[in-house]
A protein has these predicted regions:
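Generic hydrophobic, amphipathic alpha-helix propensity
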Residues: 11-22, 37, 62-66, 70, ...
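Amphipathic alpha-helical segments used for helix-helix packing
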Residues: 99-123, 167-171
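Hydrophobic/aromatic-rich alpha-helical bundle segments in the mid-to-C-terminal region
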Residues: 4, 145-191
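Basic, amphipathic alpha-helical hairpins
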Residues: 21-29, 106, 148
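Amphipathic alpha-helical packing segments from all-alpha helical-bundle domains
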Residues: 72-75, 103, 121-148, 155-159
Length: 197
């Protein structure tokens, strides 16, 4: 028999899965309505409000979950690729960006979530609401600190990079224009390498 916590986790997951399914299968890029989400998830409407303030809070949390999957997948692959090797920070960042772009290319369905949610989700991430991203975020801050940036400047650099990466990678991965995804990846790597020089 499932515990109360397991039931809560399951219901929250069902709501998020329903929202993701509705969002990625729809013809518009608008968040689904709460009624659509609870109907697909098979839960009462009141249950929705136990986990989310409104549909925008749901979309923010869904974005953070998908972002965490992307970052954690890229981190895992980067660690595997560089295991046992001494590498410069620039090579480490380039390998990480390679893996982020590979994930983006293989998971295009979640990209429309990114377009308009970067700044609100970044604020949530800074508040520590997304523990799955904390390790990657802290690693990036330390990387910039090693290169002479203050903590504030490091956080600002991460925000600027994420804010640039999200929308341009969406356009490139989904539409293939105005530049190909590989071109954007190379540009981001050059930009990051210059920041760390």
């Amino acid at each position: 028999m499932a515990t109360v916590e397991e039931n809560k986790t399951e219901k929250r997951s069902k709501l998020m899965e329903a929202a993701h399914s509705l969002f990625t299968s729809g013809s518009t890029l608008k968040p689904p309505t709460i009624d659509e989400v609870v109907k697909m998830a098979g839960v009462a409407k009141g249950t929705f409000y136990l986990y989310f303030k409104d549909k925008y809070d749901l979309m923010d949390q869904l974005f953070l979950k998908k972002l965490a999957e992307c970052v954690n997948s890229a981190l895992f692959k980067t660690r595997q690729q560089l295991a046992g090797r001494q590498v410069e920070d620039a090579e480490r960042v380039n390998a990480f960006l390679d893996n982020v772009f590979m994930y983006i290319d293989e998971n295009k369905a979640f990209l429309p979530l990114i377009r308009d949610r970067v700044s609100s989700c970044y604020r949530l991430m800074l508040k520590g609401r997304e523990a799955e991203l904390k390790e990657a975020y802290d690693s990036l801050v330390k990387l910039f600190l090693r290169h002479g940036f203050t903590e504030y400047e490091s956080e600002m650099n991460i925000y600027m990079l994420v804010s640039m990466l999200a929308p341009v990678s969406c356009d490139s991965a989904i539409q293939g224009e105005p530049y190909k995804l590989d071109e954007i990846k190379s540009g981001m790597q050059r930009l990051t390498n210059k920041l760390l020089a």
